[in-house]
Each structure stands twice: as C-alpha cells, then as structure tokens.
C-alpha cells in the first residue's frame, strides 16, 4: 500500500503471515538505494517510506521545483498537465519502489504483488516505472512476477484490517 506511508502484507496459502514478531510485510523501513541521507519519520534515513510515500513525493517535488510543499494531489495534477518535474518525481518514486520490491520478491518468491493505497491511484505514471525497475532488478523467473493494482483501490487497507479483525476475532471490552 502506497499512501501517507508504505505498508505491506504477506499471505501464505491464503492466510496472512505475521512473522515471529508480528511485523511481516513491513516495507516502510526497508533501506532504499539512494545517494544522500533522506530523513524518515522514524528518525533514521533512506527508508522506502521517506522516498516513495505520498508525502515524500510531494516533498521531493517541492525541493526540485523550489516551491512550498503542496499535497500529492496537486503534484499529480501538475504531472497530468505535463510538468516535467512532477513527472520525474513520480517516475523516480516508482523506480525506487520497483527496485525494493524486486529485493522483497527475491527473498519471498511471491505469486503476485498487489499495489494499492492512495498514491497507487496515480496509475501508469507510477506503476509503469515501478514494473520496469522490478523486471530489471529481479532475478530469473521472479522478474516475471505479476504486479497488479489493488481491485479495492484506496479501500484495500481498510478492508484488509477488517478481515484481519474478523479472522482473529478481536473482542473489544468496555
């Protein structure tokens, strides 16, 4: 999920895989192949969320264009109107996402990678460079892993959380 942050989940045999510490699929704080120290909200640098989330793309546009930071939706509108800086920022974020996902796929060999969240709604301008970078970076047959947009769009994380709650029968007591 690409939005205000970066999130992920792994399923194995149709079941959500939590991992030994409950953090399986946490992609936000994977290191990214960038030059420079880009600060992350966690206090460290060069994490995926710091360079490819919606706020990161908006901040990068502001830095490159020399303008105040504006919402990602404004950057996307500029991209659609042909702004070369906006197009480059989105493409660069897609490329970094694709490279990191190639590493994740090399480790876990998934059948499919589903991309959702608000920033994923940018569409082909983000997903095309993501897919291209993934195909170049991934090894062997992993490079052919299907990369699909989430069918539920921006609702995917909410539906996933609700399904998790239902599956684990979380009870709320007053």
Give the positions of each predicted feature.
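Glycine-rich phosphate-binding loop of actin/hexokinase-like ATP-binding domains
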Residues: 1-51
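ATP-binding/phosphotransfer module of carbohydrate and carboxylate kinases, centering on a glycine-rich
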Residues: 11, 34-40, 44-174
